[in-house]
């Protein structure tokens, strides 16, 4: 059923019943669904090609619309979106989350500050998690969601 909700754009609804195709972030949209599909796809061999197609289409949506203006966190920021992408595009997205880039984006008013900057899902700890797993070559998983 989940696969049938994918929009033509590659995104998924942010809530049900489906409405506007608007949010592209882990907590609402393609990045979260892709992370889920990547975790379960081996358990559904008969759906493998449909799942792979949905992931491919969802990643195209993230590449087009996933460089967000919210602080770079796991839940609704660039770091979380990066973890749903292939390695090359993940690195590209994470290049926007370096300390230098973040300061520049903040200075230019292009990034909204988090209400919870120390938090895991909505703050700096999530950005650190994303960088750590990429640096160590670990599977791209979301801490506390599909990391076990």
Where is each model-derived feature located?
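C-terminal structural cap/anchor segments
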Residues: 48-88
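Broad hydrophobic/π-residue packing in well-ordered secondary structure
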Residues: 1, 11-14, 26-28, 41, ...
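Terminal, non-catalytic domain-edge segments
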Residues: 39, 43-45, 57, 61, ...
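Glycine- and aromatic-rich loop/turn segments at beta-sheet edges
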Residues: 3-24, 59-76, 99-117
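Cytosolic regulatory protein-protein interaction regions
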Residues: 22-34
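Periodic glycine anchor positions in long extracellular repeat architectures
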Residues: 29-32, 77-80, 123-126
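Histidine- and/or cysteine-centered catalytic micro-motif in compact active-site loops
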Residues: 17, 36-39
């Amino acid at each position: 059923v989940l696969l049938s909700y994918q929009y033509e754009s590659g995104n998924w609804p942010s809530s049900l019943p489906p409405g506007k195709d608007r949010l592209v972030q882990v907590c609402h949209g393609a990045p979260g669904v892709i992370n889920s599909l990547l975790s379960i796809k081996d358990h559904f061999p008969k759906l493998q090609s449909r799942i792979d197609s949905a992931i491919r289409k969802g990643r195209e949506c993230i590449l087009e619309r996933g460089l967000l203006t919210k602080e770079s966190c796991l839940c609704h920021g660039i770091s979380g979106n990066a973890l749903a992408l292939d390695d090359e595009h993940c690195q590209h997205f994470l290049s926007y989350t370096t300390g230098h880039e973040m300061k520049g984006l903040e200075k230019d008013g292009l990034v909204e500050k988090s209400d919870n900057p120390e938090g895991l899902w909505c703050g700096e700890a999530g950005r650190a998690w994303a960088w750590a797993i990429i640096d160590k070559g670990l599977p791209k998983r979301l801490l506390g969601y599909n990391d076990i």
